[in-house]
Regions:
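Hydrophobic, small-residue-rich alpha-helical packing segments that form membrane-like cores
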Residues: 144-212, 218-221, 225-233, 240-265, ...
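His/Glu-based metal-binding/catalytic segments typifying zinc-dependent metallopeptidases
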Residues: 37-40, 47-49, 155, 159, ...
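Non-catalytic terminal extensions that flank enzyme cores
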Residues: 1-45
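Non-catalytic, conformational "gating/processing" segments within enzyme and secreted inhibitor domains
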Residues: 200-235, 651, 655-656, 675-710, ...
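Generic recognition of flexible, low-complexity loop/linker segments
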Residues: 92, 203-207, 264-266, 309, ...
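Active-site recognition of the HExxH zinc-binding catalytic motif
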Residues: 58-70, 523, 527-531
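Extended, domain-scale alpha-helical bundle/helix-rich regions
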Residues: 427-454
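M16 family metallopeptidases and their MPP-like homologs
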Residues: 43-53, 79-127, 134-140, 167-192, ...
Length: 917
């Protein structure tokens, strides 16, 4: 067993799930818990998590999360976190407030960067200037402006976060389930309560919770662990003796049968937009076998519209959709069923309907094949670890969670034995017993009713503005040359092009049908087809049976539209109908068989299909309405892009406001038979005639097997139409505002711009030198930035209390950047931070898709090298010239905003048209 001076090693163990070794330690002086995850992952990660348990709705821990990153003893600058964002090579850099903990993680492939970041993070959390500077508290938490209005970054963020009916319902549900513990409070802060937080209480809470003996530190990846532990000990932990007894969470007496009726204030209350949430406790956090069993059980019974419990509940026609929620990261895990699109009368019938459906399932028994499929799917996800978070960041969060609730930071990093144990229980009736135990108690219930609002419901430190001084700052020389893409091969086979890139581990098999010959109005129907496929039968299987087969044999399977444009001037748009499959190599034959049946044989006409269309289209409309409130900046950006290039227009038609209008039109017509005929005709034309590229990311053995399977599959065709560019007419730019519920705004200004990789440096300067200060720190928006896409650039704000003021700030940006002086160190920071994003490590599935994207768009390693070279050539003169030239460009840009009724009406002169969504 290794020895580390200053630490006591508790245990060391192999961990196949992490492809390495785990070591748990305690720091002798401070009592800090430390977990080492040693493996060969070069995307090294660090995380420090504190147990933080709110006692009110002031959001004190959320404000602290923001505040500690705003300057520290060693780094006494206004915004060290922002300076790291613009100059670091990190693949992940953030902080997160959870209901019971606050975690500060990062990941980076660069050793020097890792040491810099670790020191900045540790100095921030243990020695923040915010404890002696109330200005940070006022900026990040709350303050009153000259006119008496309350503002602040967290205050404004939470106004947006709590604007949606979903967020308000969830908070009410937590209060009903946990009336006496920390989980009953809004950890992010309720705007109604945030102004009650004083600076003195904020300081007291920090001192009690941000101590070394109330933290868990994780070091992950390929690194010199002894060196990192020595730094931790010497610079921080050895100087922090154990405090008094650390704060602890308490268990809540369960509240079966608790009922809350909650109004949701909206200017346009509709009687069929009532929501009803039912929730149950699922047992002890430490019983990881049981909690994984709950996850698998919910997947088997509720994952799709055809899953037995969800299908039975939808058949009662109580509402438009039913969502599930399961949180097993808290001391008392919970599950939730949420009925959407209901009336008051139907919502009151939801709990009895659930009881009835569960009882019926218990009478017949849960089908074994459903449980096996859900278990396989969960196990594949555990192995693949999909999503964008680096593995080390996930481990740091999980380590903090396990340590917090059980004292064992390694608890959540071991899963193999859990899956093995549950697999052995499939035949024992264990899951039936679990189902009975979960749903026997009366649920906690929250009924949310849209309601028109009533009138009364309307709503000295040592610091410098200088640069962050690191011991070993990164320069352009640290960038390296970038990794070359794996060399692929292409060959004709069975009427298709077979593309293969070598890879080990999971297989990724993607089928791309060219849509170059599709009319623009048909693209929306194809997109809808990808949304409804899960709900449709085939001649051989019901939708439920086919979904079970997919989960049993495939790790992931989805149909989607892909829209890609090359980098060259005037490059065409490549539109594809795509079937994406991820699997283990032993399942390749089944994958081809199941994928072919799912895509080709689903029955698109008839009574069953028509019922599915009515159900799914209604669900999609509801989900888009929720997303307008939560992610308005994305919809605004999509709308703006539609005016300038074909890919943007096609994307907006399939994911933006135009698609929402399309769904509303279908619901209004309710001619589901005609819809089925249309979908069938469009699908037949594409699958039978369109050029097909089959992309395999896998071994040579898998390629040989696929060469045998493909000619005998549904994907084979004697002849296909050659691929061609997708075209669509563009509409003239229009300044538009869309009114949404909620008290925040999402403002976008976009303009066309020929691709030039050097402009990405300008975007980074704009984001972190001007917008961050003007829009976020002064204006109080939660997020802001400048983005460069191929052919278009735009400025945006996110959860912004302002609308007109932000557009004014956009207009002032060019002059502010052009007047700024740029030192050699400034340029190094901007260039390093920008160029590093070209090489952000990707997980296997994302890496496979990126290689396919490069193939279709003709992107070569030489092009990427040229981008890197161009970035590194940016100098001060170019930056100032680019900034100055922006003034004329911005004045001709298009404005698109999603915002509150009051904000939009106060700035309606900025827009050519206004629409209420």
């Amino acid at each position: 067993m290794a020895h580390y001076p200053g630490y006591t090693v508790l245990r060391t163990e192999d961990c196949p799930e992490q492809h390495g070794t785990l070591t748990l330690l305690t720091h002798d002086v401070s009592g800090a818990a430390v977990l080492l995850v040693e493996n060969e992952d070069v995307n090294k990660a660090f995380g420090i998590g504190f147990g933080t348990f709110p006692s009110d709705d002031t959001g004190v821990f959320h404000i602290l999360e923001h505040s500690v990153l705003a300057g520290s003893e060693k780094y006494p600058v206004s915004s060290p976190f922002v300076q790291l964002l613009k100059s670091s090579m990190a693949s992940f850099l953030n902080a997160m407030t959870f209901p019971d903990k606050t975690v500060y993680p990062f990941a980076t492939p660069n050793e020097t960067d890792f040491c810099n970041l670790m020191d900045v993070y540790l100095n921030a959390v243990f020695r923040p200037l915010a404890m002696v500077d109330s200005a940070v508290f006022e900026q990040e938490g709350w303050h009153r402006d000259a006119d008496g209005t309350v503002s602040g970054v967290v205050y404004n963020e939470m106004q947006g976060a709590l604007a949606s009916p979903d967020a308000q319902l969830q908070n009410a549900l937590q209060r009903a389930m946990f009336p006496d513990t920390a989980y009953g409070f809004v950890s992010g802060g309720d705007p109604a309560s945030i102004p009650a937080l004083t600076y003195e209480k904020y300081q007291r809470v920090y001192r009690r919770h941000y101590s070394a003996d109330n933290c868990c530190i994780t070091l992950y990846g390929k690194m010199d662990m002894a060196d990192k532990l020595a730094r931790l000990d010497k610079d921080y932990l050895s100087k922090m003796p154990k405090a008094a007894a650390r704060p602890r969470l308490t268990l809540q007496d369960e509240q079966p049968g608790a009922f809350v009726e909650l109004p949701y204030y909206t200017d346009q209350p509709k009687p069929d937009e009532v929501q009803c949430a039912l929730a149950w406790y699922t047992g002890a956090f430490a019983d990881r076998e049981r909690q994984l069993g709950v996850e698998i059980l919910l997947g088997a019974l509720l994952n799709t519209n055809s899953s037995p419990l969800k299908a039975a509940l939808l058949a009662e026609q109580l509402g438009a959709d039913i969502d599930i929620g399961f949180d097993d990261s808290t001391l008392q895990p919970t599950l939730e069923l949420l009925l959407r699109g209901a009336t008051v009368d139907s919502a009151r019938k939801f709990a009895p309907a659930v009881r009835k459906a569960v009882d019926k399932l218990l009478e017949t028994g849960i089908p074994h094949d459903l449980l096996l499929a859900a278990l396989n799917e969960a196990e594949f996800a555990s192995l693949e670890r999909p999503g964008s978070l680096p593995d080390g960041v996930l481990d740091a969060i999980n380590a903090a969670t396990g340590w917090l609730h059980t004292g064992d930071a390694a608890l959540l990093l071991h899963t193999d034995q859990l899956f093995a144990a549950l697999r052995s229980k499939l035949e024992e009736g264990w899951f039936d017993t679990l189902l009975r135990e979960l749903f026997t108690p009366a649920p906690v219930q929250v009924l949310q009713i849209p309601t028109a609002p009533k009138a009364e419901d309307a709503a000295a430190p040592v610091r410098t503005d200088g640069k962050l001084v690191l011991e070993h700052p990164l320069t352009a020389a640290d960038l390296g040359a970038g990794d070359a893409a794996p060399q692929g091969s292409a060959e004709p086979l069975a009427g298709a092009t077979l593309l293969r890139h070598p890879s080990a581990g999971s297989l990724y098999l993607n089928f791309y049908y060219d849509l170059g010959g599709i009319a623009p109005e048909e693209l929306q129907y194809l997109n809808l087809l990808t949304d409804v496929l899960d709900e449709l039968d085939t001649p051989a299987h019901t939708a439920q049976q086919l979904n079970t087969l997919r989960s049993t044999w495939l790790g992931d399977s989805r149909a989607q539209l892909d829209l890609w444009t090359g980098r060259q001037e005037g490059a065409p748009c490549h539109a594809k109908l795509t079937l994406c499959l991820s699997l283990l190599e032993r399942s390749l034959e089944k994958a081809v068989e199941i994928g072919g049946e799912w895509l080709y044989d689903t029955v698109l006409t008839g009574a069953a299909a028509e019922a599915a269309y009515a159900r799914v289209v209604s669900q999609l409309k509801l989900r888009m309405e929720q997303l307008f409130i939560q992610q308005g900046n994305e919809f605004a950006s999509t709308r703006a892009r539609a005016h300038y290039y074909v890919e943007g227009a096609a994307d907006e038609a399939c994911t933006g406001v135009s698609y929402y209008h399309f769904l509303c039109s279908l619901l209004e017509k309710a001619d589901w038979a005609a819809l089925g005929v249309k979908l069938d005709a469009v699908r037949r034309r594409v699958l039978q005639n369109a050029a097909l590229t089959v992309s395999l990311h896998g071994t040579e053995a898998a390629l040989e097997k696929l060469r045998t399977l493909l000619p005998q599959s549904r994907f084979a065709a004697a002849q296909r139409t050659p691929a061609q560019p997708y075209t669509q007419p563009l509409t003239p730019p229009v300044n538009e505002a869309f009114i949404i519920d909620g008290g925040v705004n999402y403002d976008v200004l976009a303009w066309p711009m020929p691709r030039d990789s050097r402009r990405r440096v300008l975007a980074r300067v704009m984001s972190y030198e001007y917008l961050w200060h003007t829009i976020r720190e002064v204006g109080g928006a939660y997020g802001t930035g400048m983005l460069c896409a191929d052919g278009i650039e735009f400025l945006y704000t996110y959860r912004d209390p302002h609308l007109r003021e932000s557009y004014d700030a956009f207009a002032d940006a060019p002059a502010a950047l052009a007047a700024r002086d740029y030192t050699a160190r400034d340029l190094d920071e901007f260039i390093v931070g920008t160029a590093a994003k070209l090489d952000t490590p990707r997980k296997a599935r994302a890496a496979a898709r990126e290689l396919d994207h490069r193939y279709f768009c003709g992107i070569t390693d030489e092009m990427r090298a040229a981008d890197r070279k161009a970035l590194c050539s940016v100098d001060a003169a170019l930056l100032k010239a680019q900034a100055a030239a922006l003034s004329d460009v911005l004045s001709g840009g298009v404005r698109v905003a999603f915002g509150s009724k009051d904000a939009v009406e106060a700035a309606k002169d900025l827009f050519d048209r206004v629409e209420t969504l």
